[in-house]
């Protein structure tokens, strides 16, 4: 086999994998993780089901690969928002608006993203696939932690464990997004909309981070 033959084969494999991911994206987003059918994914991608399994060991593996691919685009956009001019507080507010707007517009994607934490839903996933998504989470958290660290270094925020604070803010933000999608839990917010509650949460965090006045 010549070098060009090998390159052609690799290109075909890459295109085939891309078609499977594109078909999975449409079906996962339409039906959700639990209802998504791999027979339909294979049919939509124009491949045999056995071919699909050569690339992805299970539905969970396919789901994680899809998240990792799309998550990188989210990370790049988040980094752009974080790098915008302004104080640390202003940039955290912008990140909050971006995060809320992105996930409320892509709520199905949010649901399957966090299904990773429920093995009963996803089944046993390959460690390498899970590691790819964990790296994505860590990279996004690092963006937020870096903004907080900049605020500490400038004296805008008081001293704190910036990684811990980023994790807490991230966790609370995701809890509010889950509330936004759950009818009974939304009622607990009273007259406030989920967006208002999310905004208030960010402001409370910023108050807690603010350096004591001298």
Can you say where each PLM-predicted feature lies in the sequence?
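Short, Lys/Arg-enriched C-terminal cap helix and immediately downstream tail that follows
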Residues: 64-65, 75, 177
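Short hydrophobic/aromatic patch on the recognition helix
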Residues: 46-56
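Basic, helix-initiating cap at the start of DNA-binding domains
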Residues: 1-31, 35-44, 61-64
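C-terminal peripheral helix-coil segments that are non-catalytic and often amphipathic
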Residues: 1-4, 98-105, 138-154, 167, ...
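Short coil/turn segments at alpha/beta junctions that flank glycine-rich nucleotide-binding fingerprints
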Residues: 30-34, 85, 106, 154
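Amphipathic, non-transmembrane alpha-helical scaffold segments
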Residues: 13, 63, 67, 71, ...
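Hydrophobic alpha-helical connector segments
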Residues: 65, 69, 79-109, 165-169, ...
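Short secondary-structure transition hinges
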Residues: 101-146, 153-156, 163-164
